[in-house]
Swiss-Prot record:
It is found in: Cytoplasm. The lineage of its organism: Bacteria, Pseudomonadati, Pseudomonadota, Gammaproteobacteria, Enterobacterales. This is Adenylosuccinate synthetase. Binds 1 Mg(2+) ion per subunit. The gene is purA. IMP binds at D14, E15, G16, K17, N39, A40, G41, H42, T130, R144, Q225, T240, R304.
């Protein structure tokens, strides 16, 4: 039996992690975010009511769950307070259910200003960030000049540190990017107004998780974005600024790596990507448009239209390697309903004619890749809301089986709709 389960994306994000975390937290005591920031967009549908979470873990809707934001997360105080208010207005007692690590780096106004200015300066070469200050906040962390939640306990020292770091960043903004400086007093006043709320939720996350583990409590670690956006293993530089892979769980929460029992990879039945970067199976035809519209492929955070394409098993196999996946959860199978045929990319043809079954590491090496497909019959029957494997069309079952064969990983959960009830749990990760 596995007490500690990781849920992460195996593609370029937007795989449907939030719903699955919410579903599985029925048995969890703790849900932990360990990387990313409010650039994530996790959509939950419960009894027809939609909730979109960006920063707060998806376990927050459960009264039996304590939600934790770990040290690997860059935390925007403004975004957190906005999200807390939205939930509290619906009667959810967020402050009773949410805890923070004091080591979370803070995202402040100057990080957002830098993010936006840089993307604008890149012009046609823009990475396609969410413009929410994520990258600049991680830069400050690595440069050891970042402000953290724990700094708010000493407000006078915080003010001094803020003045120093803001002078540094305003020099860049004014002299290099030719934009207005960020006002020191406004940033300070905004943070001080909510400092006590933030510090009241601070705990020693590593110790809390270790004590929970020793008691045998079930813990779930909720990933954001996807494996192929990992800062080290993704399609660099078209990546996010954190480790979205299983390795980020230990460093981003403080739990020991040996205590992770099961890693669940969320895999969409087709591929999507937001922003710039390599995407070998991208479709520019009517099928691509069909997938976008039927799958409602618009970002929960930015509203941007997602690029769509066939399932890329080559890219997913890289995610299997990096994350040592225990099993898959297949999502959005119902979006493929009605297609005469479905395709899986099983290899790449490189510009020099070679066939390869692993992904390149550098973004430039993806140029000119041609996907090699296996084509399978589609199905006309609806899979939407089907809750038993026996209720799926044979062609859909064949597609599922082939995914398992080409990736070497079993599909333990199948999602056939946005509601938590529209799910088949073939093997519960907490029982694996």
């Amino acid at each position: 039996m596995g007490n500690n389960v990781v849920v992460l994306g195996t593609q370029w994000g937007d795989e449907g992690k939030g719903k699955i975390v919410d579903l599985l937290t029925e048995r969890a005591k703790y849900v932990v975010r360990y990387q990313g920031g409010h650039n994530a967009g996790h959509t939950l549908v419960i009894n027809g009511e939609k909730t979109v979470l960006h920063l707060i873990p998806s376990g927050i809707l459960r009264d039996n769950v304590t939600s934790i934001i770990g040290n690997g997360v860059v935390l925007s105080p403004a975004a957190l307070m906005k999200e807390m208010k939205e939930l509290e207005d619906r009667g959810i007692p967020v402050r009773e259910r949410l805890l923070l690590s004091e080591a979370c780096p803070l995202i402040l106004d100057y990080h957002v200003a830098l993010d936006v200015a840089r993307e604008k300066a890149r012009g046609a070469k823009a990475i396609g960030t969410t413009g929410r200050g994520i990258g600049p906040a991680y830069e400050d962390k690595v440069a050891r000049r970042g402000l953290r939640v724990g700094d708010l306990f000493d407000k006078a020292t915080f003010a001094e540190k803020l003045k120093e770091v803001l002078e540094y960043h305003n020099f860049q903004l004014v002299n290099f990017y030719k934009v207005e400086a960020v006002d020191y007093q406004k940033v300070l006043d905004d943070v001080m107004a909510i400092a006590d709320v933030l510090t009241s939720m601070v705990v020693d996350v590593s110790d809390l998780l270790d004590q929970a583990r020793k008691r045998g409590d079930f813990i779930m670690f909720e990933g954001a974005q996807g494996t192929l956006l990992d800062i080290d293993h993704g399609t660099y530089p078209y990546v996010t600024s954190s480790n979205t892979t299983a390795g980020g769980v230990a460093t981003g929460s403080g739990i020991g790596p040996r205590y992770v029992d099961y890693v669940l990879g969320i895999i969409k039945a087709y591929s999507t990507r937001v922003g710039a970067g390599p995407f070998p199976t991208e479709l520019f035809d009517d099928i691509g448009e069909f997938l976008c519209k039927k799958g409602n492929e618009f970002g929960a955070t930015t509203g941007r239209r997602r690029r769509t394409g066939w399932l890329d098993a080559v890219a997913v196999r890289r995610a299997v390697q990096i994350n040592s996946l225990s099993g898959f959860c297949l999502t959005k199978l119902d979006v493929l309903d009605g297609l005469e045929e479905v395709k899986i990319c099983v290899a790449y043809r490189m510009p020099d004619g070679r066939e390869v079954t692993t992904t390149p590491m550098a973004a430039d090496d993806w140029e000119g890749i041609e996907p090699i497909y296996e084509t399978m019959p589609g199905w006309s029957e609806s899979t939407f809301g089907v809750k038993e494997r026996s209720g799926l069309p044979q062609a859909a079952l064949n597609y599922i089986k082939r995914i398992e064969e080409v990736t070497g990983v079993p599909i333990d959960i199948i999602s056939t709709g946005p509601d938590r009830t529209e799910t088949m749990i073939l093997r519960d990760p907490f029982d694996a």
